[in-house]
């Protein structure tokens, strides 16, 4: 239920939780969310989602409304390298109908807490410059833009 207060603010419950099983609502959500994130990527298959869930290094986090509807998702990867434990955030997307409500912030803060609990020294992410709101959110949370280059090698 949404309660409207004076000033036009909506109050609603959002739960952030790790995904523990592939469900129809999860696959349906990815069919809607992935095109909002990338026009060049296809939604993951049930098998791909299952491999992520079973992975020791990756976790899918979702933001659910009070009715269990999935409003957003992200992937957190935590990994050990010779210089310590690191974490990486990928594929952060909040449904366009739910943006501006702090859901992206809640997802990121949950991921940061999980990374901290796992002993990560740092958490990195990338964001296209055109995603102005997302970039501002990351700065507001405390991410610092690094002076580095990101390179990609593609097998496709």
Regions found by a protein language model. Give the residues of each.
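Conserved beta-strand in the GNAT
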Residues: 62, 69-78, 88, 93
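Active-site rim helix/loop that mediates acceptor-substrate recognition in acyltransferases
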Residues: 9, 41-60
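Conserved GNAT acetyl-CoA-binding A-motif
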Residues: 115-127
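Conserved active-site alpha-helix within GNAT-family acetyltransferase domains
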Residues: 105, 117, 129-147, 152-153
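Helix-loop element at the rim of GNAT/NAT acetyltransferase active sites that forms part
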Residues: 31-43
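A conserved beta-turn-beta hairpin within the catalytic core of GNAT-like acetyltransferases
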Residues: 79-89, 99, 146
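Conserved N-terminal entry element of GNAT/NAT acetyltransferase domains
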Residues: 2-24
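Conserved acetyl-CoA-binding loop-helix of GNAT-fold acetyltransferases
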Residues: 94, 100-113, 140
């Amino acid at each position: 239920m949404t309660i409207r207060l004076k000033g036009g603010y909506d109050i609603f419950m959002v739960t952030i939780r790790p995904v523990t099983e592939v469900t129809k609502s999860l696959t349906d959500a990815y069919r809607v969310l992935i095109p909002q994130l990338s026009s060049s990527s296809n939604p993951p298959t049930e098998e791909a989602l299952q491999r992520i869930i079973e992975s020791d290094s990756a976790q899918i986090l979702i933001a659910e409304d009070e009715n269990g509807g999935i409003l957003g998702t992200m992937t957190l990867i935590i990994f050990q390298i010779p210089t310590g434990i690191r974490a990486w955030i990928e594929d952060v997307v909040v449904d366009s109908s739910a943006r501006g409500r702090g859901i992206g912030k809640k997802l990121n803060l949950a991921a940061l807490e999980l990374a901290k609990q796992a002993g990560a020294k740092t958490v990195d992410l990338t964001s296209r410059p055109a995603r102005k709101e997302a970039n501002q959110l990351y700065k507001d949370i405390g991410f610092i833009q690094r002076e580095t280059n990101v390179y990609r090698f593609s097998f496709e």
